[in-house]
Amino acid sequence: MSDASKRSLNPTLMMNNNNTLPKPLEESLDLKEFIALFKTFFAKERGSIALENDLKQAFTYLNEVDAIGLPAPKSVKESDLIVVKLTKLGTLHLDEIYEIVKRLRYIVVLQNAFKPFTHLKFHERLNAIILPPFFNDLILLLDDEGQIKQGANATLDALNESLNRLKKESTKIIHHYAHSKELAPYLVDTQSHLKHGYECLLLKSGFSSAIKGVVLERSANGYFYLLPESAQKIAQKIAQIGNEIDCCIVEMCQTLSRSLQKHLLFLKFLFKEFDFLDSLQARLNFAKAYNLEFVMPSFTQKKMILENFSHPILKEPKPLNLKFEKSMLAVTGVNAGGKTMLLKSLLSAAFLSKHLIPMKINAHHSTIPYFREIHAIINDPQNSANNISTFAGRMKQFSALLSKENMLLGVDEIELGTDADEASSLYKTLLEKLLKQNNQIVITTHHKRLSVLMAENKEVELLAALYDEEKERPTYTFLKGVIGKSYAFETALRYGVPPFLIEKAKAFYGEDKEKLNVLIENSSTLERELKQKNEHLENALKEQEDLKNAWLLEMEKQKEIFHHKKLELEKSYQQALNILKSEVASKDTSSMHKEIHKASEILNKHKTDQEIPQIITSFQINEKARYKNESVLVIQILDKGYYLVETELGMRLKAHGSWLKQIQKPPKNKFKPPKTIVPKPKEASLRLDLRGQRSEEALDLLDAFLNDALLGGFEEVLICHGKGSGILEKFVKEFLKNHPKVVSFSDAPINLGGSGVKIVKL
């Protein structure tokens, strides 16, 4: 036997091979217990939870049935064996026929319940199920316990009557012996015991002198189960009649099975319809039992909006409110801050919506797209037996998904298992390919480089998990548009790592990287402030919109008034013209020409062009002006309408005349800047992108950017000029060398753009 064959027979290796199989999606998303709980609401045990029907149609049925109510079906068994037996011309047992009857009765109950609601789509579906006459008779054949009703078969009725009579005689005999004085010393109790289908007595040893019979069994205490000789003959008759009853039932089952074979196609249809109705009932009962809501997946919307969604695995969840409006969501930020649970929540909501399973969510304000496939790369695929490393396993999973379209993919800790810089470049390429194939992706990562690279793509959203530095714990909230800090040192301290080791680690970490983290924190702070300002602006914008609507209404009103006035003037003009014509008819021609000439002169006198004078603001040297809410002094007049101005702090700026506002006449004495605190300008930013600009435009933008950065109090900024031919980089270097406020500048680290970006210290 070869080594390969031996390995294949090794049970340990076989178990390891099974472990390499991907986990079911519901297990990866922590939905296993939730789905198991949901399955308990079905009338029939089933593996699949999918709805084998049109989702839109099923959603309509759910709403209609929820408003009226649906009676729950009895529990039923699997129907596959019934179909197989009938297909092979076999005979069904009575309990299998009863499984058919239970389904038929449920259909009939539904049809009767929805008879008054003819306007419903669900009524149309039920009405389409027309039972053949044979099945109406079959429903009446069995009782609620699945036994043949009395009167259905005369022979069977006679046998049952005989059986009942004999059982009564047997009971009477046992009762007589149980209360007999001769047998009292040997009786353990006076009850009738049932063993092997026979009623018998429980006796002590030595009974043979008092009674004769057959010992059926001994008890654990050494007593004897005895069938008296007089009851033995009756027991034989009972057994004989029981056999005759079984034969009669078998004959009836054979007859019924032959009839059912003729309706095999209808039975397949019946089983399928019952399973669908059972699925609806299970979903409704599950939703009512746990106060859950349904979300119909959208086949047109691409964006995902979740409001007050709670993952089922969480006992005290903080409801998730999130808008995922682009093709990819990159989640960064603090360790143990809820990034993985956010990823699982997004995929879980899509999975549950796809199968119309109710969830804890505000359905009216939520939108979930329909995805053909949902995949999760969450667990570590490492397997030593199959020589698969973590990174190799991840690549194997990715390679299987590269051809997929219209799927939702979730990847947790995407950088797992290899070098960070190489992984960033590799995953950027893989993710961009998947995005081009109309897929939506959610990733969690601590790679700042990967986040920066992907942020350049317009279809990528950034989301950061936030950390409360005062309380020293995650807030389990998220901020859009920023790259979050991991807070690895703080997390390690929170989970018991000694502080002196944390300080030592920070020293190894380096000052430059710590500054980068400070920049990231400042960026997050500015983003939060900007978010608050945006809310105020939205309110102000709404007020302006209301004013605009009121103004438009007033304009329409004034237009209507103007139109009425115009009609009145035209009417007056026509009347005057008619009077003039009648007057002219009575006068001579020369007098008429004089009047017309005179009127023409009067009209020309009032004919003037109303030109709006253009106000051109110009400034003189030593004249005060206002620049972006700052008081400045004009020092020098430059070309193309530019001025060199000096702020109250003594900084000199280059500004266009259109940016300046005249406030008062300049003082005669030289302007002395007082020591005041100047607020940061709203336009201040940490980064300037000059790529694609002409040299002259780029230098103007750079000058204004540095001015704003100085006013904002920034000590370090980033200027992106790109690599390209190097012309723009040359101009930028020359400008920075000659700028009086630039302390130094250097190329940025590789993860921030390398030689295509300059870090400028002010």
From Swiss-Prot:
InterPro entries to which the protein is assigned, alphabetical: DNA_mismatch_repair_MutS_C (IPR000432), DNA_mismatch_repair_MutS_core (IPR007696), DNA_mismatch_repair_MutS_sf (IPR036187), MutS (IPR045076), MutS2 (IPR005747), P-loop_NTPase (IPR027417), Smr_dom (IPR002625), Smr_dom_sf (IPR036063)
Record domain Smr: where: 688-762
Keyword Membrane among record annotations: no
GO BP annotations, alphabetical order: mismatch repair; negative regulation of DNA recombination; rescue of stalled ribosome
Pfam families, sorted: MutS_V (PF00488), Smr (PF01713)
EC numbers, comma separated: 3.1.-.-, 3.6.4.-
Keywords from the named record: ATP-binding, DNA-binding, Endonuclease, Hydrolase, Nuclease, Nucleotide-binding, RNA-binding, rRNA-binding
Listed Gene3D superfamilies: 3.30.1370.110, P-loop containing nucleotide triphosphate hydrolases
TM spans (from-to): none
Residues engaged in binding ATP: 333-340
SUPFAM superfamilies for this protein: DNA repair protein MutS, domain III, P-loop containing nucleoside triphosphate hydrolases, SMR domain-like
Gene Ontology molecular-function annotations: ATP binding; ATP hydrolysis activity; ATP-dependent DNA damage sensor activity; endonuclease activity; mismatched DNA binding; ribosomal large subunit binding; rRNA binding
Function: Endonuclease that is involved in the suppression of homologous recombination and thus may have a key role in the control of bacterial genetic diversity.
Subunit composition and interactions: Homodimer. Binds to stalled ribosomes, contacting rRNA.
PANTHER family to which the protein is assigned, alphabetical: OS10G0509000 PROTEIN (PTHR48466:SF2), OS10G0509000 PROTEIN-RELATED (PTHR48466)
Similarity annotation: Belongs to the DNA mismatch repair MutS family. MutS2 subfamily.
Name of the protein described by the UniProt record: Endonuclease MutS2
Organism of origin: Helicobacter pylori (strain J99 / ATCC 700824) (Campylobacter pylori J99)
Lineage of producing organism: Bacteria, Pseudomonadati, Campylobacterota, Epsilonproteobacteria, Campylobacterales
